[in-house]
Amino acid sequence: MPPSPHMESENNTIMRTKSYFITLRTIYRRELKGYLGVPFGWVILACTMALQGFILQAVLQIMTQATGNGVMYHMLDNLNFWFYFIFIFPLITMRTLAEEERQGTLEGLLTAPVTTTQIVLGKYFAAYTFYLLLWLPMLLYPLVSDIGNYYTEVRYGIQPEGSITYMLADWVGPYTILALSGAFFVALGILCSAMSRSQIIAAILSTCLMIMYYFIGRVTELWGEFPAAPIFHYLSCTEQVKAFASGVVDTRPFVLYLSLTVFTLALTKRVVDYRRWTR
């Protein structure tokens, strides 16, 4: 008995979906290999680890005073942290599409039997994965410090301030907001790379936009409170990070950053589509 048209339609849909994700995975692996398979990616990782260690050392000196806040709060409230945090994203994303243009491989990619969405998402998820990998060492530094202090207090008969479970839970908020804000900043960097034919210009453009977004949250510090101040408080990445680092988990940053990420990726798709049509 031959299969019904309905079953054939379902099978075709399944096959197309499977083929779509196989192609997306291929692009993702290719791009991720471009980060981990070349010295440039490891240089970024090494520099990030060194800066994280430097900031942790400064934070531990600050914490010799009773502040009532944890290690992660002070690390994210450090100006040096924001300096290198902003500059990480241009380094990660400036090569995604601008480098393809320079090497002459973008022509082949845009004329290949792949959709623009697959290209954008494959590059985005690879860059975002690499960004998340950069924070794994940062998880170990303060965690080892806290656990070491905990067992030292227990050994010398001092009542610990919190359990190890509490310490581990103390990292959930900070890493959540770093993942959320990073999702948007990576998307913004890829958009700048799509708009430029030069890595340097893409890096400068994305850096300027991220610095502008950073200072949006500082408007109330410069001008004080005014009727529109709640909007700037809502957009302030510094206030969000400090709130999450203090253990205050708010749903509004989830909505904000996920919406901005989707919008930026959609805009990137339109830019790549335009470059595809004009070839």
Task: List PLM regions with ranges.
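C-terminal coupling/interaction segments
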Residues: 1-10
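Secretory targeting signals
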Residues: 54-57, 71-84, 126-197, 249
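Hydrophobic alpha-helical membrane-insertion segments
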Residues: 39-50, 125-137, 205-221
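Terminal transmembrane helical anchor/hairpin motif
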Residues: 59-73, 195, 202-271, 277-279
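Transmembrane helix boundary and interhelical loop/hinge segments in multi-pass membrane proteins
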Residues: 90-110, 124
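Aromatic- and glycine-rich beta-strand/loop motifs that create alpha-glucan
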Residues: 11-45
